[in-house]
Amino acid sequence: MVRWFTAIRVRLRDLRQSTFFMNAFYLMLSTFIVAGFGFIFWVIVARGYSSTTIGLATTLLSVSGLLSMLSLAGFDTTFVRFLPKSKRPNDHINNGLVVVALLGVVLSLGFVSTLSVTSPSLIFVQHNGWYIFGFTFFTVATSLNVLTNAIFLAQKRVRDIFIINLLFSAFKVVLPLLIIHGSVMTIFVMVGISQLVGLVLSLGVMKVRFQYTFSPKIHGDIMRLTRKYSFSVYASSILNLLPPTILPLIIIHRLGSSSAAYYYIVFTIGSALYTIAYASMQSAFAEGSHNEAAMRNHILKATKLIGVLLAPAIVVVLAFSNVILKIFGSEYATGGSGLLRLFAISAVAVAACSALGAIFKVTHNLRGVVAMNIVYAAGILGLSYVFIPKFGILGVGWAWIAGTIAAAMVGWAFLKRSNSNYKLREG
């Protein structure tokens, strides 16, 4: 017995000394904290707002999320890949912050100007100057907050991400307790304020940790150095984000705002499963960016970690999906439990795509990562459009499973054909 406890203690000590496992642990914990507090946030909101109001708010948040991700222009992945060995980290960071902020403003205003065509249900935003300002401002704040996370990951300071996310997520939960009733924009602004708090905290920590100093100057030589890589990962990121952000628009158009609310809540919960794979492979990506020669070992470690954690998590969701969703109300359990189970089943294919994506980004297999995400986006969105009239909201889940499996198969084909230095089976 003593030997057994000693062995466990030694193993835990080894894990604490491994930057890969600690970064993966903090990434998972950070995402679970955000998801957990987000879960509480929506439980509170669901008690004070109608499902129609929540459906419109979640659609607006989804669009804002898409625009904030589009604003990143690939800088988040580029930071993780190039910052570790950069001799001018401040210039890299300032390039990213300035370009992302400017692009965020342009995209947000562009979207608002086309609401009558792209999303008539959100046209109310266009009719109020403060709504336009709030939508633009908080979309930019969200994109910059996400970008700062990439900076901490690149420097292997993931513990800071966890602390910052814990603080701004806790703050987010307090807001609906203070503002019990309101409109669609009330919900949107509450989420936006929490993102702004996270951004301010991140910039403060960057100043202390990395002696970061902001400058609005764009350094063209650095932009030219990374533009091909940035453009390719930007394209793949756009494709990867299209399904979760465009699906609410399809659902609200074909099934109504209540179904959009069910989808948003279900996907928020289902994303917690995907976090296991995403966090593990992001940690492998960060470690591989510091030391490409060790990439194979990190991928294998990540795969083992995913296997240990993901299987029981899937079983729990499959068994208790109805119970979980009843927390939001019986209508959510009735309307979304089947979809949640399908999202859980797709987690295995999502993990495979995450692993392949990490390999492609480190080895600069840019065609592979773009092709895989083309199949992913086209498969999920195209099949959802076909399946929804036949299966209702469950059609989204079946499309998600088929699309991710197809994407993983395409990614595997590119890996097998790759001439990069990384070979999955080589030691």
Q: Whereabouts are the PLM-identified features?
A:
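Interfacial segments at transmembrane-helix termini and the short loops linking adjacent helices
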Residues: 16, 21, 117-135, 257-258, ...
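Hydrophobic alpha-helical transmembrane segments
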Residues: 129, 133, 162-210, 375-379, ...
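Alpha-helical transmembrane segments of multi-pass membrane transporters/permeases
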Residues: 24-33, 87-94, 136-137, 151-177, ...
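Transmembrane helical elements of multi-pass membrane transporters/channels
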Residues: 23-38, 167-169, 187-210, 219-285, ...
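Signature of the first transmembrane helix
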Residues: 2-3, 18-76, 231-257, 381-385, ...
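Helix-loop junctions and terminal segments of transmembrane helices
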Residues: 71-87, 154, 270-293, 359-362
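Interhelical loop/hinge segments that connect adjacent transmembrane helices in multipass membrane
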Residues: 4-17, 159, 163, 187-188, ...
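Membrane-water interface segments that mark the loop-to-transmembrane alpha-helix transition
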Residues: 22-34, 60, 69-116, 130, ...
